[in-house]
């Protein structure tokens, strides 16, 4: 509402600068009014808008710009139709490393062209592509033979592709789990050989510790006690040593019989303290003795079986989901 009035010092300085002095009040008032008018002109002149310069920063606009559609991608049809087309193009590119193809048109005619151009001219609401084979082009090169098919066939092929991917994924996981389980159980029975000539110290420190370690790992164990001629043989199945042709019983004096019996008693005492699910033995101290010891199943084995069962369940659920989705897509088509 009120106009800004210059300070009196500015007005007074202007008076002396013009070498004018007014004695009367009216004359001074007139002169002050003229100074105010001149001040207004100067102020308004300085407030004129400045012309834009090329160095002025460009104004920034908030918000993302709308993304332009890619002119190299077919924009017709639904997203599923475009995904089905992309699978065919990727398959051709990965196998042939080329864009050339021979296309079977809906009319039945063959056209040697670039597959990317053909894909852009398709109306995906009505048609799709399918690789049906391989053919030599005019230059003698092997190129894919691609057929223009109806939309329903293209969607069915895409559903089959997804089903194969899921099956391959779960089969790979299942095979990996099976291989891991097989590696763990590659040698389900370990043969530990003990000579009748072993010293009590070696039996207690070496052989007993070896047996204990195997059983604690969940490893099933054969313990074969015999003469050096028996334990040095290559043995596939220790139980085969106890048929009639392998029996070689010898007469023992009291000292040797007592020593061998002590070895057997030491093993029996040790096995009572170890984690076993079953213990069986056969033979006699006058020939050879075999222990068949089955270890308690480890907790890891149970967890592994549970994981394999869960993988199978997931695979079944995924197959059902894909089958349902495939039927839904075919019904819409």
From Swiss-Prot:
Regions of compositional bias (Basic and acidic residues) in chain numbering: 71-80, 297-333
InterPro entries according to UniProt: AIM23
Pfam families listed in its UniProt record: mIF3
Subcellular location: Mitochondrion
Annotated region described as Disordered, given as residue ranges: 43-80, 296-333
Boundaries of the annotated transit peptide in chain numbering: 1-28
Coiled coil residues, start to end: none
Top-level division of the source organism's lineage: Eukaryota
Subcellular location, principal: mitochondrion
Keywords: Mitochondrion, Transit peptide
Entry GO terms, CC: mitochondrion
Family according to the record: Belongs to the AIM23 family.
Protein name: Altered inheritance of mitochondria protein 23, mitochondrial
Source species of the chain: Komagataella phaffii (strain GS115 / ATCC 20864)
């Amino acid at each position: 509402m009120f106009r800004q009035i210059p300070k009196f010092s500015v007005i007074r300085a202007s008076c002396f600068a013009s070498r004018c002095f007014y004695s009367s009040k009216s004359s001074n008032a007139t002169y002050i009014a003229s100074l105010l008018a001149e001040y207004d002109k100067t102020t308004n002149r300085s407030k004129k808008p400045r012309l834009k310069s090329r160095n002025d920063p460009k104004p920034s606009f908030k918000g993302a710009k709308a993304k332009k559609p890619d002119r190299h991608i077919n924009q017709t049809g639904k997203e599923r139709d475009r995904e089905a087309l992309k699978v065919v193009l990727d398959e051709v590119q990965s196998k042939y490393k080329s864009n050339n193809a021979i296309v079977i048109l809906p009319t039945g005619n063959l056209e040697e062209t670039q597959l990317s151009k053909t894909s852009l001219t398709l109306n995906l609401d009505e048609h799709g592509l399918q690789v049906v084979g391989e053919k030599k082009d005019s230059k003698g090169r092997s190129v894919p033979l691609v057929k223009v098919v109806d939309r329903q066939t293209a969607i069915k092929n895409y559903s089959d592709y997804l089903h194969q991917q899921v099956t391959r994924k779960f089969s790979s996981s299942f095979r990996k789990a099976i291989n891991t389980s097989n590696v763990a159980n590659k040698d389900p029975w370990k043969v530990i050989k003990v000579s009748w000539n072993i010293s009590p110290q070696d039996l207690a420190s070496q052989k007993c510790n070896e047996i204990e370690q195997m059983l604690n790992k969940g490893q099933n164990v054969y313990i074969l006690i015999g003469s050096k001629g028996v334990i040095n043989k290559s043995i596939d199945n220790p139980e085969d040593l106890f048929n009639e042709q392998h029996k070689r019983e010898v007469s023992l004096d009291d000292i040797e019989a007592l020593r061998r019996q002590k070895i057997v008693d030491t093993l029996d005492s040790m096995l009572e303290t170890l984690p076993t699910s079953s213990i069986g033995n056969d033979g006699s101290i006058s020939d050879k003795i075999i222990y068949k010891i089955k270890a308690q199943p480890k907790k890891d084995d149970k967890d592994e079986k549970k994981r394999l069962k869960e993988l199978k369940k997931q695979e079944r659920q995924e197959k059902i989901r894909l089958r349902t989705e495939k039927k839904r897509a075919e019904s819409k088509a």
